[in-house]
Design a protein with these regions (language model features):
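An N-terminal-biased, well-structured beta-alpha scaffold segment characteristic
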Residues: 1-89
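Hydrophobic Val/Ile/Leu positions in short beta-strands of Rossmann-like dinucleotide-binding domains
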Residues: 5, 157-159
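Phosphate-binding beta-alpha-beta segment of Rossmann-like dinucleotide-binding domains, i.e.
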Residues: 83, 89-156
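Residues at the starts of beta-strands that form the adenosine-phosphate
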Residues: 156, 178-179
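Glycine-rich Rossmann-fold phosphate-binding loop(s) that bind the pyrophosphate
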Residues: 162-163
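N-terminal Rossmann-fold NAD(P) dinucleotide-binding loop
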Residues: 166-167
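Aromatic pocket-lining residues of Rossmann-like dinucleotide-binding sites
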Residues: 173
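Rossmann-like adenosine-cofactor binding region
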Residues: 181, 185-225
Length: 225
């Protein structure tokens, strides 16, 4: 068995791959001509495959895409090829969910505005310095500063697509005590961490009720509208 990798991975990753591969021959191709030469008798490939590389791969049985999305990876010859094509589905769910909540917290607490103000040495709260609550006003006073910021525990998060990424985002939302509503074309039964599960036809309801909306659907002709 022979595995070709292109673009080449760093030495640390190559060492781990070699350990896992056992007796398999590993070729870490630094350029496309080297990859083309090695693919002539290769059984497996990891990385970014091109039509010219596939054309010489007579024994190719398995192609591993290094990303979860495939829209920038596949091409007609690969679609027609009998090899098995796999992706990194589920591998990036936690990273993407963390990134989503970085944005949610940023906009909820106006961090994007505070950073701009900081660059100008302005430290006034969003809502105005005059809106600061004095002790005399009492704890029930709602100021312009309060209204300019969101408590995400009072917010609704809409999730479009309940794949591995969408479910991980919903799990984090529940940890922040957010209400989660979702739409998915496949998930018909109530999903964990989702308060309301809607059909695709009910997408307008999700958009109407959500303070934040996350599109976690794959990029396909059906979702590009």
């Amino acid at each position: 068995m022979k595995l070709v990798i292109h673009p080449a991975v760093d030495q640390a990753r190559l060492t781990e791959i070699t350990k896992a591969a056992g007796t398999m021959t590993i070729v870490n191709a630094t350029d496309e001509p080297s990859a083309v030469l090695a693919l002539s008798d290769a059984n497996a490939f990891f990385g970014k495959l091109t039509p010219s590389m596939l054309a010489v791969a007579q024994n190719l049985e398995w192609v591993q895409c290094p990303t979860a999305s495939l829209e920038h990876f596949v091409f007609p010859e690969l679609i027609e090829h009998p090899c098995v094509l796999t992706n990194m589905r589920g591998l990036y769910s936690d990273v993407i969910a963390d990134h989503v909540f970085a944005y949610i917290l940023c906009f909820a607490r106006n961090l994007h505005l505070y950073l701009r103000q900081q660059m100008r040495s302005v430290y006034e709260p969003i809502g105005g310095e005059a809106a600061r609550t004095a002790f005399a006003t009492g704890p029930d006073h709602i100021s312009a500063i309060d209204r300019a910021h969101l408590d995400i525990a009072d917010c609704t998060l809409g999730v479009v697509g309940l794949g591995s990424i969408g479910r991980e985002i919903a799990r984090r939302a529940c940890a922040f005590d957010m209400r989660v509503i979702a739409v998915d074309p496949v998930q018909m039964e109530q999903a964990p961490n989702v308060s309301v599960l809607l059909s695709l036809e009910e997408l307008p309801r999700l958009l109407n009720e959500s303070d934040f909306v996350v599109i976690a659907a794959p990029h396909t002709p059906d979702t590009e509208r």
